[in-house]
């Protein structure tokens, strides 16, 4: 694995919610952060069929354009009763004809699909969030870190915190959805200490323990 020697890192996302979460996770490590949106970098087409492939596409595009190491997250929701859908295509389920994303409609779409197959009980709605974080360099080298969290797709949505599908995801062992949790509840962790709750924080913890040092 390759360390981030320059202490400079590009966050390869134009998603405001995701950028906020990643920036919060990176903060203790004293890195100079810039986002793809700030740098006005183009958004590459996510043509991969795995989370790893799409994470690499985004990270390498930013690294190639800037000459700096770039971090990208590709994440999604897998619902067992739907054969793992929406999975790697999670963001596409929210895509509208004008190019924007409407996650309220996407959550409703999942609920409609579950109703169609008669998946009404909590036991029939097992789901998980998956996050793959990729750090890529301009020479095409990359490291990958995967995190996941098991839970249940619940309806109706609850909470207005977080972003995306957070209001419909109830993690196992908890009474609050991700949409009802504070940032600390969802992402809090310490190096070489407890396992964080969220999929993204779990992936980032692996990255930090392998590539980063506290500032």
From Swiss-Prot:
Q: Which cofactor does it need?
A: Mg(2+)
The entry's free-text remark on the cofactor is:
Binds 1 Mg(2+) ion per subunit.
User: Where is Mg(2+) bound in this sequence?
Assistant: 74
Q: Which CDD domains match?
A: HAM1
Q: Which InterPro entries match?
A: dITP/XTP_pyrophosphatase, ITPase-like_fam, RdgB/HAM1
Query: Belongs to which family?
Result: Belongs to the HAM1 NTPase family.
Oligomeric and partner information: Homodimer.
Q: What is this protein called?
A: dITP/XTP pyrophosphatase
Q: Which organism is it from?
A: Bartonella quintana (strain Toulouse) (Rochalimaea quintana)
């Amino acid at each position: 694995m390759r360390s981030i020697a320059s202490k400079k890192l590009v966050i390869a996302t134009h998603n405001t919610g995701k950028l906020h979460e990643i920036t919060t996770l990176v903060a203790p490590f004293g890195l100079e952060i810039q986002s793809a949106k700030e740098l006005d970098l183009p958004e590459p087409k996510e043509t991969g069929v795995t989370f790893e492939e799409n994470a690499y596409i985004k990270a390498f595009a930013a690294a190639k354009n800037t000459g700096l190491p770039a971090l990208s997250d590709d994440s999604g929701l897998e619902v067992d009763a739907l054969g793992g859908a929406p999975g790697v295509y999670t963001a596409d389920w929210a895509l509208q004809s004008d190019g924007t994303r409407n996650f309220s409609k996407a959550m409703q779409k999942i609920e409609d699909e579950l109703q169609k197959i008669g998946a009404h009980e909590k036991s029939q709605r097992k789901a998980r969030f998956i996050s793959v974080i990729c750090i890529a360099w301009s020479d095409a080298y990359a490291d990958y870190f995967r995190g996941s969290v098991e839970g249940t797709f619940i309806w109706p949505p609850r909470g207005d915190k977080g972003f995306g599908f957070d209001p419909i995801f109830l993690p196992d062992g908890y009474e609050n959805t991700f949409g009802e949790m504070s940032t600390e509840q969802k992402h809090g962790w310490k190096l070489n200490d407890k396992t964080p709750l969220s999929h993204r924080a779990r992936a980032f913890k692996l990255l930090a323990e392998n590539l980063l040092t506290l500032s």
